[in-house]
A protein has these predicted regions:
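Solvent-exposed soluble domains appended to multi-pass membrane proteins
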Residues: 2-308
Length: 308
C-alpha cells in the first residue's frame, strides 16, 4: 500500500490462488453439475474488469515458488529449467516488484498460507525487498477442516465487495499459480498419452485465468481483455499510476514481440507457438536471457538503475 508520500497511487493487492483453474476452457465437452465459480466467472466478463489467461511454467500441481518468481521479478523460467530459483539462486538482494514499489514510497507485505520457511521464503522475501512477511504461524486460524473448507467464491466476493466501499484507489491482480494435479485416470480419459503431447495441448495444460479489478476506472493499455500472457509479463503495475522501471518498460516492448515466454514454449506476435530449443531463440529472447543473467547472477556488473 502507498504511504502519504505517494498519495494518489493505488493500493495494489495481488492474489496468487493455489491451483486456480477453469478446466472448461480446454477440455471440450467437460461439464460439471454446478458452476464452481459463478461469481469469478461473472466478474471476469464485466467490461470494467481486465481478464485473460496466464501461461505458466510450473508443472501441474506444483511449482508455486517458480510462478511467484516469474511474477515478482519479470524473469522467465525458460532459462531456469529444472531449477527452483528461490532455493538455489536468490542468495542476495534481487530486484523485484516489491523493491520497485518500496522505492516508489510503498509499504510492502507478503502473506502465504503455508509455513514461513517453505521454499526459503523468509530469506527470499527479504532479499526481494518486502518489509514484512506473514506465514501460517502468524495467523489465528482454525486448521480443523472437519466442518468443511471455506468457500472460495464467498471469499472472492467478500474481497471485492470490501474494496468497492474503500475510498482509496485500489487494484486487485488475481491469477492461478498452476493447474491442479488430478488423477491419472482423469487425464487418460482426455489424452492418449500425457507424456507425449503436442505443443498446443501442452500449452492448454499450463495456463490459468487472471483478472485485474479496480475500484476506479482502469486504463487497459498495458494488458487487453482476453490477452494470453506469461507470468513474467503479468507483474506490471497497472494503469500508469506508478512509474515503471526501465526493465519493466523493456518487458512491455518484448511482450509485443513474444507475448508468452515460458519453460515450455514461447509465442510470436502472430500467436504461433515455438518450442524452447535454443536454436529457436530469436535475438530478442537471447537479449532477454542476458538481462536475466545480469539481474540474478552478475550482481557486480548489474546495470545501474535498470531494474529499479
Amino acid at each position: 500500500m502507498p504511504t502519504i508520500a505517494t498519495e494518489g497511487s493505488p493500493n495494489i493487492v495481488v492474489v496468487m490462488n493455489e491451483s486456480f483453474s477453469d478446466l472448461t476452457t480446454y477440455l471440450e465437452g467437460y461439464e460439471t453439475s454446478t458452476d464452481p465459480m459463478p461469481y469469478v466467472r461473472s466478474l471476469m466478463k464485466r467490461d470494467d474488469v481486465v481478464s485473460g489467461t496466464c501461461a505458466v511454467s510450473s508443472d501441474m500441481g506444483t511449482g508455486t515458488a517458480n510462478s511467484e518468481f516469474e511474477f515478482l521479478t519479470g524473469n522467465s523460467m525458460a532459462y531456469f529449467k529444472g531449477n527452483t530459483p528461490y532455493v538455489q539462486f536468490i542468495d542476495a538482494e534481487t530486484p523485484s516488484l516489491a523493491s520497485l514499489l518500496a522505492g516508489r514510497g510503498y509499504s510492502t507485505m507478503a502473506m502465504h498460507a503455508y509455513e514461513r520457511a517453505g521454499y526459503n521464503r523468509v530469506k527470499v522475501y527479504d532479499r526481494f525487498g518486502f518489509e514484512a512477511y506473514k506465514g501460517i504461524e502468524d495467523f489465528d486460524v482454525d486448521l480443523d477442516y472437519a466442518r468443511g473448507y471455506p468457500t472460495d467464491e464467498a471469499n472472492y466476493r467478500q474481497l471485492i465487495s470490501y474494496f468497492e466501499t474503500v475510498d482509496e484507489p485500489t487494484v486487485v491482480l488475481f491469477f492461478g499459480d498452476h493447474e491442479p494435479r488430478l488423477s491419472n485416470e482423469f487425464y487418460s480419459s482426455w489424452f492418449t498419452d500425457e507424456n507425449d503431447l503436442d505443443l498446443e495441448t501442452t500449452a492448454q495444460l499450463h495456463k490459468t485465468p487472471f483478472f485485474i479489478w479496480g475500484n476506479y476506472s482502469l486504463s487497459t493499455e498495458s494488458i487487453q481483455k482476453g490477452s494470453v500472457v506469461s507470468l513474467n509479463f503479468y507483474g506490471f503495475v497497472p494503469d500508469g499510476r506508478v512509474q515503471l522501471s526501465p526493465y519493466q518498460e523493456y518487458l512491455a516492448d518484448l511482450r509485443m514481440e513474444h507475448p508468452v515466454i515460458t519453460a515450455r514454449y514461447f509465442t510470436t506476435a502472430f500467436g504461433d507457438k515455438v518450442g524452447t530449443a535454443p536454436s529457436a531463440f530469436t535475438d530478442s529472447i537471447h537479449e532477454y536471457q542476458w538481462l536475466q543473467y545480469n539481474c540474478v547472477f552478475d550482481r557486480a556488473h548489474r546495470i545501474p538503475g535498470f531494474y529499479s
